Amino acid sequence: MNTAYIGRFAPTPSGYLHFGSLVAALASYLDARAVGGRWLLRMEDLDPPREIPGAQDAILRTLETYGFEWDGELVRQSERHAEYAAVIARLLSQGLAYACTCSRKQLEGYAGIYPGFCRNACHPDHDAAIRLRVPELDYHFIDRVQGEFRQHLGREVGDFVIRRRDGLFAYQLAVVLDDAWQGVTDVVRGADLLDSTPRQLYLQELLGLPQPRYLHVPLIIQPDGHKLGKSYRSPPLPADQAGPLLLRALRALGQQPPTELQGAAPAELLSWGRANWDAMRIPRSRTLAEAQLR
């Protein structure tokens, strides 16, 4: 096994896996396995109020039904709260983060860019969100599919939340710490997270953590213009359609499975995918229309 490549799939149990999830899982799986790399599974269960009972078990069953095999033990973010809290305490003590008591109503009209109301205040950090101070700098990276991506953190994002006011830890912090802890070298995920990457680069730099390579695959868009996702009640992956949907996902990723694989079992499709994977064939687009993939 090639330990120089470590990839991962990190679903959230706020719903079941859908076709968009399958495309992301397949891309990350094949990108790792094609070079003999490791593929890890992490459950991003940071938000218990949004978690659907039974979703974690359903996600695991679906991955197994579709032929995915992961390395090592399943990691749950809910088991790593102490690590997140320790880093936040460090950032606060260094003046790199601060407590914010702004309400959603106060922030209406700012287009999601924090205006800095609490930046120079001295609020206690209980009953407050914790925000990370961001520099007035332009961050950029080369995505393996999407190419160069740039974002000015100060103008386009503002100081961002790393712990919510209700005490729940934010995705941006947890994903950076977990990727580093697990030794992830390659992050392959949906293009909806492209905009988050500069924030993660900044956190990696601030904490002295290694920077993985990034590859963002196109999102699958429904006819109404919404992405396939849990928020829009996209249909879960059916157990009896694993072969046809894997074949469709391969094509969505620009791979060219031969016609004789029509009707093939998941194991055969994944074997072909490992042997023939070419990330350069992935469409250089942030979105793909679901209707075009049928």
Curated annotation (Swiss-Prot):
Which domain of life does the UniProt lineage start with? Bacteria
What is the protein name stated in its UniProt record?
Glutamyl-Q tRNA(Asp) synthetase
Keywords linked to the UniProt accession: Aminoacyl-tRNA synthetase, ATP-binding, Ligase, Metal-binding, Nucleotide-binding, Zinc
Q: Which GO terms describe its biological process?
A: glutamyl-tRNA aminoacylation; tRNA modification
Entry's PANTHER family?
GLUTAMATE--TRNA LIGASE, GLUTAMYL-Q TRNA(ASP) SYNTHETASE
Q: What does this protein do?
A: Catalyzes the tRNA-independent activation of glutamate in presence of ATP and the subsequent transfer of glutamate onto a tRNA(Asp). Glutamate is transferred on the 2-amino-5-(4,5-dihydroxy-2-cyclopenten-1-yl) moiety of the queuosine in the wobble position of the QUC anticodon.
Task: Quote the cofactor binding remark.
Answer: Binds 1 zinc ion per subunit.
Residues binding Zn(2+) are: 100, 102, 114, 118
InterPro entries reported for this sequence: Glu-Q_tRNA(Asp)_Synthase, Glu/Gln-tRNA-synth, Glu/Gln-tRNA-synth_Ib_cat-dom, GluQ/Sye, Rossmann-like_a/b/a_fold
Q: Where does L-glutamate bind?
A: 8-12, 44, 171, 189
Q: Can you list the GO cellular component terms from the UniProt entry?
A: cytosol
Matching entries from SUPFAM superfamilies are given as: Nucleotidylyl transferase (SSF52374)
Give the residue ranges of motif 'HIGH' region.
11-21
Positions bound to ATP? 230
GO molecular-function annotation terms? ATP binding; glutamate-tRNA ligase activity; zinc ion binding
Q: Which Gene3D superfamilies match?
A: Glutamyl-tRNA Synthetase, Domain 3 (3.90.800.10), HUPs (3.40.50.620)
Q: What class of enzyme is it?
A: ligase
Its needed co-factors are: Zn(2+)
Chain positions of motif 'KMSKS' region: 227-231
Known EC number(s)? Answer: 6.1.1.-
| Family, similarity comment | Belongs to the class-I aminoacyl-tRNA synthetase family. GluQ subfamily.
